Design a protein with these regions (language model features):
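Transmembrane core module of solute transporters
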Residues: 1-113, 216
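Hydrophobic transmembrane architecture of multi-pass small-molecule transporters
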Residues: 99-101, 105, 117-215
């Protein structure tokens, strides 16, 4: 779910094209690769799955907390870039141990089947994540617009009075449209920020469960 809403953030807030939105995710991919290699060779042999998976989830939770700091004034370098790097590091820690644990002890003839099941589970989990984020973001954005509608209306009336423009005049319509667009932008970013905070808490809970109960 994080990737989808980060893409929306890049395109809707920054005005990036689909191509540029894909390019700005490259630091995440590089961080994933740079972390996965030492994770498989050094971290997993030392900590085992019991230690590496909670560590990776904690790093992912940290990336969501970074994303949750986004505001209408945030730049790509201020929030998105560091968040993407940390997110890639978290994926680099969790992916090797997840697939290794999922196929460990499986007969060689059934390794392909086990990998397919893991991939399917990953896709299903991603779908649930998207559904959860969508539900939260939609409701949060609607609530934000409702709570701030009167404030925006008052700001529009004040701006039209200063500009000596009527609501139906071209200048008045431009003022209204500008303030409405700003309200929608703020509502979306507030929704995304809250959604990332929620996901960080969910992952923190998962880390706590893994640490307390242990994993195989």
């Amino acid at each position: 779910g994080a990737i989808i809403y980060l893409t929306y953030y890049m395109q809707n807030h920054f005005g990036y094209s689909p191509l540029k939105s894909g390019v700005v995710f490259l630091p995440m991919v590089l961080a994933l690769i740079a972390t996965a290699i030492p994770a498989g060779r050094i971290i997993v042999p030392r900590l085992g799955a019991r230690g590496t998976l909670p560590l990776g989830l904690a790093v992912l939770a940290g990336s969501f907390l970074i994303f949750s700091r986004m505001t209408t004034e945030s730049t790509y370098e201020h929030v998105a870039l560091p968040g993407l790097i940390v997110f890639g590091m978290g994926l680099g820690l969790t992916m090797p141990v997840t697939f290794n644990s999922g196929t460990r002890g499986v007969d060689a003839k059934r390794t392909g089947l086990a990998s397919a099941i893991l991939s399917a589970a990953q896709q299903i989990g991603g779908s649930f994540g998207v559904a959860l984020m969508t539900s939260y973001a939609t409701q949060h954005a609607e609530d934000y617009v409702t709570d701030h509608a009167a404030q925006v209306k008052a700001a529009a009336m004040e701006a039209m009075m200063r500009a000596q423009a009527l609501p139906q005049s071209p200048a008045g319509k431009q003022i209204v449209e500008t303030l409405k667009a700003q309200l929608i932008d703020r509502a979306q970013i507030e929704a995304y920020s809250g959604g990332f905070t929620m996901m960080a808490w969910i992952l923190a809970g998962a880390v706590a469960v893994l640490v307390v109960c242990g994993i195989g």
